[in-house]
Amino acid sequence: MATPRKTASKQGSNGILERLGLFGLGKIEPVILAALASELPLLLIGPHGCAKSMLLERLAKALALEFRHYNASLLNYDDLVGYPLPDEHGSLRYVQTPASIWPAEAVFLDELSRCRPDMQNRLFSIIHEKRVQGIALERLRYRWSAMNPPPCNSAENDAPESADDSVGYAGSEPLDAALADRFGFIVEMPSWKALSVTARNAIISHSDCMVAPAMAQQLHVAINDARAVSAQLEKAFAKQLTEYTRRVVDHSYTIGIELSARRANLLMRVICSVHAVRYTNDPLADLGESCWMALSHSLPQRAQGIRIPDGKLLAAHRDAWKIAQLSEADPRRMLAAESDHVRRALLALLLTQSTDAEASAHVADALAHCKSGAREAFALHLIEHAAIGRVHVAVAEQIAELAATTQREQTFNTSIAAGSTRHAVGMHVECFLASLVQSDEHGLLRNLVISLYARDEKQTIKSIDRAIASWVEMRARFRIEKETARAA
């Protein structure tokens, strides 16, 4: 596979924003520069006072762009296009004002989430296709927007991931899904609390910072270098990145995030741009890390007020990237094709090509996805078939502990105060135990039910019944698969 040619420039991209007087943005600098190199629409999301406007204004100044900054919450359409006036031929032309958008090279639509719906619809074509009323904005290159975090829709018991997640902004509404999906980059700005002490001190002591010509030139060079390398990357890694993108987008549906076909196409371009920026600064930059950086900064759900399950997203990224690096003949590709977590774990244990670490990860993942009852049945199956020799100690201990709840003789204690919920559940358990017959299989189930009741006082009749059903279903599944294998 060809490696992109390193550009001749000796100017690295690392620390450019800091040298422009923008401190604490090092982690998102490759993403910001990638947005400049690709010229894809950029949306910044962050709390008030986190330098969203300063960042974009300073970039426009450094690049010497004809710049328009509009407050979308106050914007009237005439402010944007000028005033309509019929000419002598009866055609409609617009009388431009100093604020008109027509000569702009960069447009910043601030407070986009506070914009009136009718105005937001009119801004849609600017963000999406650089047009107003169907007329092309010939000089427009950059489309930037900013907004405060919208109210976050999450599960009732979800806790905010950080203190900033709990901050609400009156009037900041989630963006329409179609509009949010037009932004190539959706970047969360760091809040004051997220900054290092050094960055905080720098912000305090550098209230104003002039853009030196040398720094402006360095920004130009970094953008041009990244733009050239991005095109090479797209050719050199097309197959690998296409597979990664497809797999991670497919996997996103399983974690509650729906990414569109447009997003898949945009993600590929974002990955190439982000890695191009990182590569021009460090030819040894890891492509997988660039994929993660691109993915985590291009999700429209962040603008829609939909909480991103970051842990699950990272797992989806790792799975997709791992498979994308495998050769076509590698048997481990079967693992990626298998959607059932339990079957995938068993397959990983059988494949000699999978490492012990990979097998352990698949087993741990399967245990995490199994419901109560099914989890214990899966653990017991692994013990019965001596299949834990390849898993790491921590996972093996978890398996042994789960299996022991069914193998160890359990004692049922009914000395609970009458009339309580706990007593009602206990009576339900007692009735179920009385229905079991003397057999090895029912003995395992008996131990499981008593263990579930004893170790968790929050168990309900429904949760006990669900665990029993899950156990029975998983045990039956293993029996059927065993009989099928024998018949074959």
What are the language-model segments listed below?
Residues 40-41, 103-107, 135-144:
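Loop/turn-to-beta-strand initiation segments
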Residues 36-75, 85:
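Walker A/P-loop
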Residues 314-488:
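Terminal-proximal interaction/regulatory segments of ATP-powered molecular machines
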Residues 31-35, 85-107:
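Conserved alpha-helical scaffold flanking the Walker A/P-loop in AAA+ ATPase domains
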Residues 4-48:
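Pre-Walker A (pre-P-loop) alpha-helix and adjacent loop at the N terminus of AAA/AAA+ ATPase modules
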Residues 207-317:
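Basic, amphipathic alpha-helical bundle interface domains used for macromolecular binding and assembly
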Residues 110-112, 122:
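Walker B catalytic acidic pair
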Residues 114-119, 129-219:
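Canonical AAA+ ATPase core
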